[in-house]
A protein has these predicted regions:
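Active-site/acyl-donor-binding loops of N-acyltransferases
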Residues: 120-172
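Conserved acetyl-CoA-binding loop-helix of GNAT-fold acetyltransferases
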Residues: 99-113
Length: 172
């Protein structure tokens, strides 16, 4: 992690942003609402129902984290744990509304720290964005010292007819 990124994270924490596990039903509702609202206009992302997240947490295979500022949820993420590795599954942030608090950076960094404290050896990002040259999400992930390991991209859309078209287009 770069010194600039760490400075942003420490500055946001000093301003009052804090990340913790989802504890109450109200926080769980805020988590689901932010996740669905963040991905509403992104047809390539499938967001499961709230019962899915509840069952993952109850089984002990995953964690739900939220970042709050003045009792407002500004970031959330869900990660799964398996065989000593943590996998960032879903994440959503209010980047534009809380620009100077860097909710994406704070949420992901605290998820990495939480996974490390639980004994996870690796932290993997499952969604690395679309396979285009200029990709802000991929650059964001690489800012944490990660390295890309995938050689191709598999598309999955929530609309079956669009899924068939994309599969046909990308098979050439």
């Amino acid at each position: 992690i770069s010194a600039k990124l760490l400075g942003r994270i420490n500055g946001a924490i000093a301003k009052g942003a804090e990340t913790h596990e989802v504890r109450t039903e109200e926080e769980f509702a805020d988590f689901v609402h932010l996740l669905k609202a963040h991905n509403y206009f992104k047809p390539k992302r499938f967001i499961p129902d709230a019962t899915f997240f509840r069952k993952v947490v109850e089984s002990g295979c995953g964690k739900l984290l939220i970042t709050t500022y003045n009792d407002t949820t500004i970031g959330c993420c869900a990660y799964a744990v398996s065989k000593g590795n943590a996998y960032l599954w879903y994440a959503a942030y209010l980047r534009k509304s809380y620009l100077r608090l860097y909710p994406a950076e704070v949420t992901v960094w605290n998820a990495i720290k939480t996974a490390y404290e639980e004994g996870c050896q690796h932290f993997c990002f499952l969604d690395v964005g679309l396979p285009y040259r200029a990709n802000k999400l991929r650059d964001f992930i690489l800012g944490y010292g990660g390295k890309p390991v995938s050689a191709f991209r598999w598309f999955r859309c929530r609309y079956k007819w669009l899924n068939r078209i994309l599969t046909h287009v990308w098979s050439f």
